[in-house]
């Protein structure tokens, strides 16, 4: 189950912030943001049967390790997104991420459910589903904390460097809350030039926090690739993963 937890940790934790990036930083509507995520979904659909065929021929070890490594590369690539990057810059990395996740998801299912006794197949499937949810929850919480810490450390310095009015603790907390989801804390009464400066600082700070979160997610995916090396032949020639 460890591999499944790490997979969902990296995937859900990282994707949680992409919605804020696409909608709040780039101003896309939910449909536009969803369209940018479609390449990953498409590659999952295309890659799953191919991964299944490969796993049937060579076992799950190589596909899982290769998939987690590819996912780590994609997450590292996403860490390079800046506030002024084009939303379309995400496409190639989402394609790689989808291709990387396909063999991992198929391989994990094959190892967990396929190697369980017939009478326990339902239990094995339930455990896999639970591991996926735990991993996603942990990823969102941990990477959210990492991003929040990065924003908290960077925002006051950037704010002061721009010679903006000093903030009291309550105001600073409100600004951090807005910036943590990629929003700029400006109102209709904010002078246009000041609003532009605040918006630039907010988006750049959010992008910096997202950069750190994606680096952590890439590291987790790489750890999953290393764990995938533990896969070894099981009883009866089947492939079993000792750490699941």
For each feature predicted by the language model, list its residue ranges.
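Transmembrane core module of solute transporters
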Residues: 1-123
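Generic "edge-of-domain/loop-turn" microfeature
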Residues: 83, 101, 220-221, 236
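Hydrophobic transmembrane architecture of multi-pass small-molecule transporters
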Residues: 111, 132-232, 238-244
